[in-house]
Amino acid sequence: MNAAVISPKRLLESWRTHRLLILTVVFLIFGILSPLIAKLMPELLKGGLGGIKVAVPKPTSLDAWTQYYKNITQMGIYVFALMLGGCVSQEIQQGTLVNLVTKGLPRWTVIVGKAIVGMLLWIWITSLAFLVTWAYTAYYFPDTRSPHVVLAFLPLLVFGLFFLSLIVFGSTLATNNYGGLLLTIVVMALLYLAQMVKSWQHANPVALIGDNMKILVNSDALTKLMPAMVIAVVAAVVLFFAAIKLLDRKKL
């Protein structure tokens, strides 16, 4: 039994535990709401000012995409972490890995299986929200102010690999679901603090979810993020490898 065999079982497990369904619904809502909120925001602002006349700029496609990236990076990634936070620790607690290991399953395939399924989930939910936002944005705001929507989306996918590796590593290291989630939040907080250092900004994985709007209007901005993308991928490989080593030493 190897990772290629175990991955379909992990996908089925995600469906049975409603993890896939919950993530799909949440991110679908993000996709629908992002352009809708941008469309309604001027009216909401006018209504909240109690009749005071204020010049509110007409919303554009940029407002819809700004809302999309805010929803994904400020809420979506943490919903994802919450759903997958116990992906390893929970199975160790429940003893479900014991039978697999006694049947000859190498422990490394558990981590690789989690990585494959987790990345498939990330690609699915972010792409779903992206496509829905794109469709509604094209309908509500048929302008040309957002020429590079696909390029702006690519760093988000790469960040997902890094973020997933952090979740899997934390879940393997921790003895419970909350420990792994806490580690993920702490590391993210440290990365956000590091982003305040100007010389580190283009090498920080957090930049992959912070500079998307710059890429949206100027494709050259993607080149500046190459160091962050490389570091994110390398860090992900290191964290997955570390998770494998940790699981090898864990008592199941």
Give residue spans per PLM region:
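Aromatic- and glycine-rich beta-strand/loop motifs that create alpha-glucan
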Residues: M1-L28
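Secretory targeting signals
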Residues: F27-C87, V112-T184, Y192, K214-V233
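Hydrophobic alpha-helical segments typical of transmembrane helices
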Residues: A64, L84, G95-T96, L208
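Helix-loop-helix units of permease transmembrane domains in multi-pass membrane transporters
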Residues: C87-M119
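Junction motif at the cytosolic side of a transmembrane helix
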Residues: V234-L252
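Transmembrane helix-loop junction
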Residues: E13, Q90, K103, W134, ...
